[in-house]
């Protein structure tokens, strides 16, 4: 029986869950999100946010999509916009990798770079400034607060993990950018499947531990880091902290070294945020009470998107 997709945005999901054999004790399973159509977990939200905008009549051929991005969401939006014939403007910190910039342009997006010192806040501010000058011309997708973001993980990623493990998982680990991935998956497993004993662990950069600071009642003090795609420097509205059980901080160096180890030992090309999530899993598994637990780790993107970064600097 043949199956033909009507456009590339419809091909998201059904990414493989793979057991690690030489990292950890055999109980770490990684979900390889680079198998999505534009090679990252963000393909899911890129598609769903645009689908929702279509359903709600927010966009047409005369309205230009706009979004602030650190790269992967922008690439996801660009491939969906191209496949469904929409125009797209993206604002992005200049510090993001050259691979991301070139891919965005190749997919037809207009790319506006912002001062890297201000991170994602600067990119968001620039997008809002552009809209304020001509609000009828643009539709802002707002990945950090758009409910279509966690929704797609609740209806696709969560069920995929549940079905592939037959519900036999104890710990979920995901690095946090917008918060949509960990929120959507956790909602599905804890609320729909009622596995309330799932331990859901968020990962953030130790150089910019804003979630940790917030939960401790401290002032939020973001800082620069090298784990592209996570640690935006604020608490995203799409991050539901009421269902997150633990937050682990990982340094940029730890994330990079672990991503390298994953490539060499397991043959899995992975980005820096994947290294951060896996590092957290390794540390958790080293604790006696978690040594026999089944751990699922989200690997957001592939290594090729970081060829110009420190991930490949020694080659």
From Swiss-Prot:
Could you name the domain of life of the organism this protein comes from?
Bacteria
InterPro entries (UniProt xref): Cys_synth, Cys_Synth/Cystath_Beta-Synth, CysK, P-phosphate_BS, TrpB-like_PALP, TrpB-like_PALP_sf
Q: Which Pfam families match?
A: PALP
Obligatory cofactor(s) = pyridoxal 5'-phosphate
Its keywords, alphabetically, are: Allosteric enzyme, Amino-acid biosynthesis, Cysteine biosynthesis, Pyridoxal phosphate, Transferase
CDD domains reported in the protein's UniProt record: CBS_like
**GO terms, molecular function:** cysteine synthase activity
Q: Which residues bind pyridoxal 5'-phosphate?
A: 72, 177-181, 273
Q: Which residues form a coiled coil?
A: none
Can the keyword Repressor be found in this entry's annotation?
no
Q: What class of enzyme is it?
A: transferase
The annotated pathway is: Amino-acid biosynthesis; L-cysteine biosynthesis; L-cysteine from L-serine: step 2/2
The EC number on file is 2.5.1.47
Q: State the similarity comment.
A: Belongs to the cysteine synthase/cystathionine beta-synthase family.
Checking NCBIfam families in the record gives: cysK (TIGR01139), cysKM (TIGR01136)
Q: What is this protein called?
A: Cysteine synthase
């Amino acid at each position: 029986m043949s199956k033909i997709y009507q456009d590339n945005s419809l091909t998201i999901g059904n990414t493989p869950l793979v057991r690690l054999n030489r990292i950890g004790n055999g109980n770490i399973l990684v979900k390889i999100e680079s198998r999505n159509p534009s090679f990252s977990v963000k393909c899911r939200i890129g598609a769903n946010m645009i689908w929702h905008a279509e359903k709600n009549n927010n966009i047409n051929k005369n309205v230009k999509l706009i979004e602030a991005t650190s790269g992967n969401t922008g690439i996801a939006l660009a491939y969906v916009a191209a496949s469904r014939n929409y125009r797209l403007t993206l604002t992005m910190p200049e510090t993001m990798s050259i691979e991301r910039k070139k891919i965005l342009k190749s997919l037809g997006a207009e790319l506006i770079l912002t001062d890297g010192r201000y991170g994602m806040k600067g990119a968001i501010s620039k997008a809002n400034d552009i809209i304020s000058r001509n609000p009828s011309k643009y539709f802002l997708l707002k990945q950090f607060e758009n409910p279509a973001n966690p929704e797609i993980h609740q209806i696709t990623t969560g069920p995929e993990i549940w079905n592939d493990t037959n519900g036999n998982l104890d710990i979920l680990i995901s690095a946090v950018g917008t918060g949509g991935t960990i929120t959507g998956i956790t909602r599905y497993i804890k609320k729909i499947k009622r596995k309330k004993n799932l331990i859901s662990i968020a990962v953030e950069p130790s150089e910019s531990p804003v979630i940790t600071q917030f939960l401790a009642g401290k002032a939020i003090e973001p800082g620069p880091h090298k784990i592209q795609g996570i640690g935006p420097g604020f608490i995203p509205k799409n991050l539901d902290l009421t269902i997150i059980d633990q937050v682990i901080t990982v340094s940029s160096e730890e994330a990079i070294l672990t991503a390298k180890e994953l490539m060499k030992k397991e043959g899995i090309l992975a980005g820096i945020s994947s290294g951060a999530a896996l590092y957290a899993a390794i540390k958790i598994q080293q604790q006696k009470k978690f040594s026999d637990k089944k751990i699922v780790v989200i690997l957001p993107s592939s290594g090729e998107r970081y060829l110009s970064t420190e991930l490949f600097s020694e080659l």
